[in-house]
């Protein structure tokens, strides 16, 4: 674990110290590069550091974190995770992504309110300082439309139907 950095340390360091640290960091990053005739490329993770794959089934989608909130939105909630897993299953066909997609859809559906026959909605509390203010947003990025679009994307992935991409996965179509 890194030692605590105190303000006194910054007073003792010079501009040359920071420059040397920047150069050392750049040289270290360069050791991770794969040299090709066209230049250098970097793997997403260095060899042997793909342990994140073991963490995904432990924490997503049932447990939440600072980046994955207990909310129904595309940016940081269950709808966005479902959109990701459905797209990855659609593009790769891997059973791992299929399992994540189904688990996430189950969690999203269990978080919904369907007491009115034929209707389903999701509620959120966005005001951390007013936890009693709970609302159902209709929006695509934050709200019911986004939840429904992720479920629709899941359906399309399961049935092989093509949908217009609503989010950032449009660049995969080039490959």
Put a short name on every predicted segment.
Residues 1-175:
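Glycan-recognition and catalytic cores of secretory/periplasmic carbohydrate-active enzymes
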């Amino acid at each position: 674990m890194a030692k605590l950095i105190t303000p006194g340390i910054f007073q003792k360091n010079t501009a040359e110290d920071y420059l040397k640290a920047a150069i050392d960091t750049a040289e270290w990053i360069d050791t991770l590069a794969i040299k090709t005739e066209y230049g250098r490329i970097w793997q997403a993770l260095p060899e042997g550091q793909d342990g994140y794959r073991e963490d995904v089934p432990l924490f997503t989608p049932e447990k939440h974190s600072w980046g994955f909130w207990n909310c129904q939105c595309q940016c940081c909630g269950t709808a966005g995770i479902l959109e990701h897993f459905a797209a990855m299953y659609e593009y790769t066909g891997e059973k791992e992504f299929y399992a994540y997609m189904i688990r996430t859809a189950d969690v999203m559906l269990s978080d919904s309110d369907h007491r009115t026959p034929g209707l389903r909605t999701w509620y959120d509390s966005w005001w951390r300082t007013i936890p009693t203010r709970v609302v159902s947003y209709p929006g695509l990025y934050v709200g019911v439309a986004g939840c429904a679009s992720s479920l629709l994307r899941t359906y399309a992935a399961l049935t092989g139907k093509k949908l217009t991409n609503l989010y950032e996965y449009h660049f995969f179509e080039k490959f």
